[in-house]
Amino acid sequence: MSEAVTIRTRKFMTNRLLQRKQMVVDILHPGKANLSKNEIREKLAQMYKTDSECVQAFGLRTHFGGGRSTGFALIYDSTESMKKFEPHYRLVRVGQAEPIQKVARQQRKQRKNRGKKVFGTGKRLAKRKSKQQD
């Protein structure tokens, strides 16, 4: 599928402070559907001779009429620096971090409203009791 796909990079910059290379990526895919982010990561890793785990592609937009997409790519020096500097949600997207498990919205509201009903020293006891239940 990806035989006639060309990937070009422009506005290349080495960012020593954040231990990465950053660039704008132009993808030419005439007559074909968009490439997946994983395919783009693998091709960029081949081009820059690095591991695909250290590559992050995002912000990909297809131009009107198709056949051409543009986005942004970051190639980190190591996976440790990627985990240190990348936003958590992007690490979750590529499977390098677990999503944050939040308490359900309704449970948060119920707990807040239970707390409103108790005043003074009883509030302290109620808080302790609710922590024991959770």
Swiss-Prot record:
Which species is the source of this protein?
Answer: Schizosaccharomyces pombe (strain 972 / ATCC 24843) (Fission yeast)
Q: What is its main location?
A: cytoplasm
Gene Ontology MF: a single term: structural constituent of ribosome
Name of this protein: Small ribosomal subunit protein eS24B
Q: Which family does it belong to?
A: Belongs to the eukaryotic ribosomal protein eS24 family.
Q: What gene does the UniProt entry assign to this protein?
A: rps2402
Gene Ontology biological process: cytoplasmic translational elongation; rRNA processing
Keywords for the protein's UniProt record, in alphabetical order: Acetylation, Cytoplasm, Nucleus, Ribonucleoprotein, Ribosomal protein
Q: Name one GO cellular component term.
A: cytosol
Q: Which residues carry this modification: N-acetylserine?
A: 2
